[in-house]
């Protein structure tokens, strides 16, 4: 007779256990949560990331103001007139987003990434039982590295002179951090996805699809690449539109 102890231990695992083990044993987490929903983890991440987002609002608001000023200046240099009322309204909404954005953005992001995860799973050969619910559970756990990303932002806000920052990419952990913020916006956005935490999340999704969708381990990296490319579609579109318009 098989030993029921492992199953019992898995049933006793809490959401806190998941938040710890997703860093060290993601396969075990996805295996025991294969039939679980995503709502609880989505709520936890919304609260945690939202709280960190709120704590970093001073840094984020300053960076967003600088980014908007840079874009308005670039538009003026091209002969485009931006009404003062539009500038004031943009900064107002930027301030609201800098304070409360994550409380809305995290759940929406998880639901959208869940759709991308479902499509990725079908592309790499996930089984027929791999549906949106399972895919969104994987997507929710893939957001856990964003907690560390927000903590990294907090540290930078303490150690750096944020008054010199003119682009959000300058406080990111991506390749775009080291590039001129005035370069082609589409290319900058694309290189902004070459980011430690974005890549980490993509790999977690690949692992989740392999475990929950019952694909082979050899398909983890291809799945991670596909979901990364899905996320890069807006940047690629921006790059294409810029090329068609002749934008440098």
Which residues fall in each region the model found?
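Membrane-interacting alpha-helical segments
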Residues: 12-34, 237, 241
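Selected alpha-helical membrane-embedding segments in polytopic membrane proteins
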Residues: 15, 28-148
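A generic helix-loop boundary/linker signal
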Residues: 9, 16-17, 110, 199
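Hydrophobic alpha-helical transmembrane segments and adjacent short intramembrane/lumenal linkers
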Residues: 133-248
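Low-complexity, intrinsically disordered extramembrane tails and loops of integral membrane proteins
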Residues: 1-13
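Membrane-cytosol interface at the C-terminal ends of transmembrane alpha helices
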Residues: 25, 110-125, 154, 199-212
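Short N-terminal micro-motifs specific to bacterial/archaeal maturation
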Residues: 10-13, 20, 126, 211
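Short hydrophobic/aromatic-rich motifs at helix boundaries and adjacent loops
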Residues: 1, 88-93, 177-181
């Amino acid at each position: 007779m098989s030993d029921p102890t492992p199953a019992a231990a898995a049933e006793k695992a809490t959401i806190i256990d998941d938040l710890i083990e997703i860093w060290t044993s993601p396969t075990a987490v996805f295996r025991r949560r294969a039939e679980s929903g995503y709502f609880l983890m989505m709520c936890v991440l919304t609260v945690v990331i939202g709280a960190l987002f709120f704590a970093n609002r001073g840094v984020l608001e300053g960076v967003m103001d600088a980014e908007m000023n840079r874009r308005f200046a670039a538009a003026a240099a091209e002969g485009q007139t931006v009404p003062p009322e539009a500038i004031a309204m943009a900064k107002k909404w930027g301030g609201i987003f800098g304070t409360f954005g994550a409380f809305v953005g995290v759940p929406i992001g998880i639901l959208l990434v869940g759709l991308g995860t479902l499509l990725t799973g079908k592309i790499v050969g996930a089984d027929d039982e791999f549906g949106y619910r399972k895919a969104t559970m994987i997507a929710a756990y893939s957001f856990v590295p964003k907690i560390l990303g927000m903590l990294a932002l907090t540290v930078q806000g303490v150690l750096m002179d944020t008054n010199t920052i003119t682009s959000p990419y300058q406080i990111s952990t991506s390749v775009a951090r080291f590039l001129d913020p005035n370069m082609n916006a589409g290319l900058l956005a694309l290189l902004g996805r070459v980011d430690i935490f974005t890549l980490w999340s993509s790999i977690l999704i690949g692992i989740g699809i392999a475990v929950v969708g019952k694909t082979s381990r050899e398909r983890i990296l291809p799945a991670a690449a596909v979901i990364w490319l899905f996320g890069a579609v807006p940047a690629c579109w921006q790059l294409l539109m810029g090329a068609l318009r002749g934008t440098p």
